[in-house]
């Protein structure tokens, strides 16, 4: 699309710009919250941004005859939602209402955008512009964010998930590309420190696993001697970090002494489940009791709300684990089949990435994988748009012909 201002012309790829806006939308909304401190203004901006993106997606789907991409997932969701309403009755009314709005305006939109976006140098150039905003967001949060009753910085989990994809993406791009490596190193180091020092432990784990996936894909292209050298280098780095762990921790705690991640690490409680094991035990027993019949969407909230109280994804308590959530909602047999089919697609997409060997596509794939990884211990697939970005890419990349078209531009 070309915009004209007198004699000035500006060529814009609308699909690409909307995709980049969507990826950074939660961060932008949180910045508005911090600056204004006004819930009504924040909600208006949030609704405006997501409605604008949803409008673009609907128009794009109609113009490019991609309506089936939306209808397929949309119809499946409606069918499962109606089944849940039939099984659970009024217990899921409010959950379905608020959850459906989020699923349609964010998750389904994220799936569509990622399923159809052209991942190339142009997309990387478009997303690079947002790193100035990401850095400003980190500075604003560190200096303007308020503390809660426990002395922790409010919204630290939201903050860390907001910068997770940009941090992982630029870190991978820094590793694999020599051009502009010094600047990428500075930015990725700054963002990684912010993620660890100011954020939650979950996003740090997501980034670490994503980097491991990236290394695995890259090593597949190396001859044996290079694989041995790489493994030796990573092992040496891990040993050095281990022996210098106390000094590193003390330095990071000097930056933010209230960091929950660093305090847990210092006290040896980094892998504490924070009562998640209680949720898992209840869901496991319920799945064993009725392994065939499904319970319906959001049904894990219903059963856990009967045993616990507190805030969560949408309302009350929730599974905090993709496997338990799917198995309980869809039943052990059907849910297991869904998980098996999906992870077969993930495996195929990774093998196709190895075959294509495209640096930019691999970088985006691994960065978006953080969305799925986070579902193993936090959030819910029904409200997490980052996970649906990855699901969209998996659906696209599990088809080798489609991936080849993306790679060739």
Language model features with spans:
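Interfacial loop-to-transmembrane-helix boundary motif in multi-pass membrane proteins
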Residues: 16-19, 66-78, 101-104, 111-139, ...
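Transmembrane alpha-helices of multi-pass inner-membrane enzymes
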Residues: 54, 170-172, 364-376, 380-409
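Long extracytoplasmic/lumenal interhelical loops at the membrane interface
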Residues: 147-150, 267-330
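Hydrophobic transmembrane alpha-helices and their immediate junctions
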Residues: 66, 329-372, 398
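N-terminal signal-anchor transmembrane segment
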Residues: 1-62, 77-90, 138-143, 373
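Aromatic-anchored transmembrane helix interface
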Residues: 44-53, 70-82, 91-115, 156-164
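Alpha-helical transmembrane segments of multi-pass inner-membrane proteins
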Residues: 116-148, 156-220
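A membrane-periplasm/extracellular boundary helix in multi-pass inner-membrane enzymes
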Residues: 193, 197, 218-266, 284-285
């Amino acid at each position: 699309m070309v915009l004209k201002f007198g004699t000035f012309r500006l060529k814009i790829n609308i699909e690409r710009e909307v995709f980049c806006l969507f990826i950074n939308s939660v961060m932008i909304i949180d910045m508005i919250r911090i600056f204004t401190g006004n819930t009504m203004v924040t909600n208006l901006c949030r609704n405006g941004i997501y409605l604008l993106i949803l409008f673009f997606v609907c128009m794009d789907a109609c113009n490019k005859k991609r309506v089936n991409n939306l209808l397929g997932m949309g119809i499946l969701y409606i069918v499962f939602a109606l089944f849940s309403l039939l099984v659970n009755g009024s217990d899921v009314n409010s959950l379905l209402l608020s959850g459906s709005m989020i699923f349609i305006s964010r998750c389904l939109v994220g799936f569509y955008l990622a399923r159809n976006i052209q991942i190339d140098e142009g997309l990387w150039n478009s997303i690079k512009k947002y790193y100035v905003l990401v850095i400003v967001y980190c500075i604003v949060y560190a200096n303007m964010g308020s503390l809660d009753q426990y002395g922790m910085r409010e919204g630290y989990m939201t903050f860390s998930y907001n910068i997770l994809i940009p941090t992982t993406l630029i870190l991978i791009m820094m590793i694999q590309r020599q051009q502009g490596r010094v600047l990428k190193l500075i930015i990725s180091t700054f963002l990684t420190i912010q993620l660890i020092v100011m954020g939650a432990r979950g996003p740090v784990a997501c980034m670490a696993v994503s980097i491991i996936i990236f290394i695995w894909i890259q090593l597949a292209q190396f001859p044996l001697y290079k694989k041995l050298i790489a493994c030796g280098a990573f092992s040496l780095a891990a040993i050095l970090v281990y022996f210098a762990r106390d000094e590193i921790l003390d330095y990071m705690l000097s930056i933010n002494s209230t960091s929950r991640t660093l305090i847990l690490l210092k006290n040896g409680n980094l892998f504490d489940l924070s009562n998640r094991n209680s949720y898992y035990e209840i869901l496991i027993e319920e799945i064993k009791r009725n392994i065939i019949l499904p319970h319906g969407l959001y049904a894990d909230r219903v059963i856990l709300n009967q045993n616990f109280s507190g805030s969560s994804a949408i309302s009350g308590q929730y599974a905090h684990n993709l496997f338990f959530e799917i198995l309980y909602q869809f039943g052990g047999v059907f849910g297991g089949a869904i998980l098996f089919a999906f992870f077969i697609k993930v495996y195929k997409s990774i093998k196709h990435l190895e075959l294509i060997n495209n640096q930019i596509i691999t970088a985006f794939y691994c960065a978006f994988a953080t969305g799925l990884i986070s579902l193993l211990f936090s959030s819910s697939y029904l409200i997490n748009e980052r996970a649906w970005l990855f699901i969209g890419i998996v659906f696209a990349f599990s088809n080798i012909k489609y991936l080849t078209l993306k790679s060739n531009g």
